[in-house]
Amino acid sequence: MKMSILFLFALIASLACLQLTFAAPAASPFANPGASPEAAPLADPLADPFMPISGMLMSGMLGKK
């Protein structure tokens, strides 16, 4: 049980690091600490390559023909 919790924590931490690695500089608060929160919606929509896929997953369109 303890190992599965540690594995889950390591998986989440590695995914967070990957997100910070591939995020656009305009959308990352670490890359641009002076950026205002209002500037986030104006960021490049192509900055997150997984956004269209997650949108399709949430709407249930992925996998339908």
UniProtKB/Swiss-Prot annotation:
Q: Under the GO molecular function aspect, what terms does this record hold?
A: toxin activity
Tissue-wise expression: Expressed by the venom gland.
Query: Where does it live in the cell?
Result: Secreted
The UniProt entry annotates AXPX repeats at 23-26, 27-30, 31-34, 35-38, 39-42, 43-46, 47-50
Tell me what this protein is called: VESP-VB2
Q: Which GO terms describe its cellular component?
A: extracellular region
Q: Which residues carry this modification: Leucine amide?
A: 62
Q: Pro-sequence positions in this chain?
A: 24-49
**Biological processes, Gene Ontology terms:** defense response to bacterium; defense response to fungus; innate immune response; killing of cells of another organism
Predominant cellular place of this UniProt entry's protein: secreted
Membership in a protein family: Belongs to the MCD family. Mastoparan subfamily.
Biological source species: Vespa bicolor (Black shield wasp)
What does the protein in this record do? Antimicrobial peptide. Shows activity against both Gram-positive and -negative bacteria, as well against fungi. Also promotes important mast cell degranulation. Shows little hemolytic activity on rabbit and human erythrocytes. Its mast cell degranulation activity may be related to the activation of G-protein coupled receptors in mast cells as well as interaction with other proteins located in cell endosomal membranes in the mast cells.
- Hey, what's the signal peptide range on this chain? 1-23
Domain of life, source organism? Eukaryota
The alphabetized UniProt keywords are: Amidation, Antibiotic, Antimicrobial, Fungicide, G-protein coupled receptor impairing toxin, Immunity, Innate immunity, Mast cell degranulation, Repeat, Secreted, Signal, Toxin
